Amino acid sequence: MAEKGDCIASVYGYDLGGRFVDFQPLGFGVNGLVLSAVDSRACRKVAVKKIALSDARSMKHALREIKIIRRLDHDNIVKVYEVLGPKGTDLQGELFKFSVAYIVQEYMETDLARLLEQGTLAEEHAKLFMYQLLRGLKYIHSANVLHRDLKPANIFISTEDLVLKIGDFGLARIVDQHYSHKGYLSEGLVTKWYRSPRLLLSPNNYTKAIDMWAAGCILAEMLTGRMLFAGAHELEQMQLILETIPVIREEDKDELLRVMPSFVSSTWEVKRPLRKLLPEVNSEAIDFLEKILTFNPMDRLTAEMGLQHPYMSPYSCPEDEPTSQHPFRIEDEIDDIVLMAANQSQLSNWDTCSSRYPVSLSSDLEWRPDRCQDASEVQRDPRAGSAPLAEDVQVDPRKDSHSSSERFLEQSHSSMERAFEADYGRSCDYKVGSPSYLDKLLWRDNKPHHYSEPKLILDLSHWKQAAGAPPTATGLADTGAREDEPASLFLEIAQWVKSTQGGPEHASPPADDPERRLSASPPGRPAPVDGGASPQFDLDVFISRALKLCTKPEDLPDNKLGDLNGACIPEHPGDLVQTEAFSKERW
């Protein structure tokens, strides 16, 4: 067994010396791979998280995570025993000179995601877990820390004593509440199913309330066994929220009308309130959820207020709900700002940055046993969740059928990088960038252009402003004569492409055909066409009539596509279509 564990450690590049044995895969944390192991010196099972320090971004995340977890000490936060360097050496002094770091943390039996995969929890269990979650959040927020990635996969459970512990602080962020951070926060990286509406609308402007929204979604999931808002992408996520969560404040209504007008009701009434969406949940729990899941974060309960709600009364004990005695302050964020600036530079400039700021966090990185015993707040962190995330990439949590560890065991990787790439395959492959996806949508006629629409329609829509005067009377009459004919936009295009692929001799009439020879017509008037030949595609007429359809605000029935059929001109003797003149007038 030990030999097999050592083999697993070598496969994933773990080099901790001989102190840790019997390595087994657990899953992925936000910043690295996680294996379980046995600490032969302390005689206990632990979880070891490996963080590769390969570039500015990974260095920034590692420094931030280590700094935060060293100061958090709470019953509902996973304990971190120590942070080690290569070959199991003590991680002291400058982190810049190391290529890898190992976080040795408390081993937890399972996580909430795996429990939910087995079925719905009993309400008493859900209530107990929610109390412990809020108890941990109260402490975390009092330390001026935002978790930013609360989800079932990052909440760990001991089934023996039903203790819940919050884990994986790889995306946590220090935010001193005494200072404004508007415009200085990186994109909130909560998994989109647990992302608040404010975070969807303004991904760079958020507060501790984003963690409370995620906690409310988790409670609803524990009570029902299903995700509360499971949108396929950010737009659908917001749509699902608006169908259930009322919008009360005028500033929120104004912003929604500006960003996504077609998804809001004129009366601002929700289609499926929480009581209707969750019929199996009792009224007291619904009242609790309604106070947590508010559209505006200013109306949302804080963790401390949530602990005082009647729904939490069976477990509430303010005397046993501690807060941090040494919260982070604005000066603790300075190093993050420096590292963010370094992240903008290329990896080739990283050596210069590291020499410029050689001791930025050296005191925080010294992990001495005597300091751990004396400090009132010791590093505490989880063994990690289910999916690796870069700061600009949002990966969705667990799939429905398997737990993260089961999926991890099904895959074999030869390196840390391959493991990361494979784990991204478990997501919905939806990349979230900044600014929000909602701001990038093109809105026309109160309807968003979905990414599956034909690209030609998207291109033509950009010409809406260029469309000037209406078509000529001749063109309209010619179009009206064909309104009842069945038409297909793409068949028209295909027919034209086919007619031009044969070469110039197929696209134009033979030179020796007297009936097709160009006549001496006045300028702007095309020559007569032959009625015995097959129709020809006129691109100018087609585009003009397509623009006519694009400028109409109402939805068009299928027979309206007959307007585009006029672009395919039957060759009847004497049937003159003023193509050139029409085109000039149109453009």
Swiss-Prot record:
This is Mitogen-activated protein kinase 4. The active site is at 149 (proton acceptor). The modification Phosphoserine is found at residues 186, 434. One of its GO terms (cellular component) is nucleus. Atypical MAPK protein. Phosphorylates microtubule-associated protein 2 (MAP2) and MAPKAPK5. The precise role of the complex formed with MAPKAPK5 is still unclear, but the complex follows a complex set of phosphorylation events: upon interaction with atypical MAPKAPK5, ERK4/MAPK4 is phosphorylated at Ser-186 and then mediates phosphorylation and activation of MAPKAPK5, which in turn phosphorylates ERK4/MAPK4. May promote entry in the cell cycle. Its cofactor is Mg(2+). One of its GO terms (molecular function) is ATP binding. It comes from the Eukaryota. Residues 20-312 form the Protein kinase domain. The keyword ATP-binding applies. It catalyses: L-seryl-[protein] + ATP = O-phospho-L-seryl-[protein] + ADP + H(+); L-threonyl-[protein] + ATP = O-phospho-L-threonyl-[protein] + ADP + H(+). Its EC number is 2.7.11.24. It holds the Pfam family Pkinase. Homodimer. Heterodimer with ERK3/MAPK6. Interacts with (via FRIEDE motif) MAPKAPK5. PANTHER family: MITOGEN-ACTIVATED PROTEIN KINASE.
